[in-house]
Amino acid sequence: MKHFIAAAVAALSLNLAFAVELEGAKFDDTAKVGGADLVVNGLGVRSKFGKRYVAALYLPTKSSDAESIVASKGPKRVALHLLKDGDGKTFSKAFVGGIEENSSEAELAGIKDRVAVFFSMMQSMGDVKAGSVVVIDWVPEKGTYVSVNNKALGKEIAGEDFFKALLKVWLGKDPVQGDLKTGLLGKS
């Protein structure tokens, strides 16, 4: 009987170790990006006009320092689990606005063409239902990849400078939402 109970506890522990959840949105606690293993750094809820999405930040190693995360080399992932229906037009405007708020004029000048490509890419996703998952991966030496429900949106967008500008939407000095940033940093 002791062995059965120990096995049951171990099995339950394994199930808990393979997923993290917030607001009913479940994420794997690890991800593979560009051949590298990443771990969930933190989760947060975007709640402008109601709860819109849960975001998960994946990194090679956990960190609670936003500036060092943005500056760090290596693959990264931001996954957004939608809690409400959304559309590409709204997403694209919000992302571009966040990039503009957190980038200098010189940074924006260097990435403006890629921001335009990203804007078009996000608009092309059209309407998305609650429960959909938008994944944004940074793969070093390759680029930024975006997918919705495991379907790629366009081709990769080159340049680490672009991904860093995008990451600052959530982790910059003027993030889209302060408590969302806190959650992604694993501080909530």
Protein language model features and the residues they cover:
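Sec-dependent N-terminal signal peptides
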Residues: 4-13
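Mid-length scaffold segments of soluble, non-membrane domains
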Residues: 63, 68-141
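Short strand-turn-strand beta-turns centered on an Asx-Gly dipeptide
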Residues: 148-151
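Flexible glycine-rich active-site/ligand-binding loops centered on an Asp-His dyad
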Residues: 155-180
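Short polybasic amphipathic segments
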Residues: 29-31, 143-146
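Cysteine/selenocysteine-centered motifs that mediate thiol-based redox chemistry or coordinate metal-sulfur cofactors
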Residues: 178-188
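Sec/Tat signal peptide C-region and signal peptidase I cleavage site
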Residues: 15-19
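N-terminal structural module
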Residues: 20-70
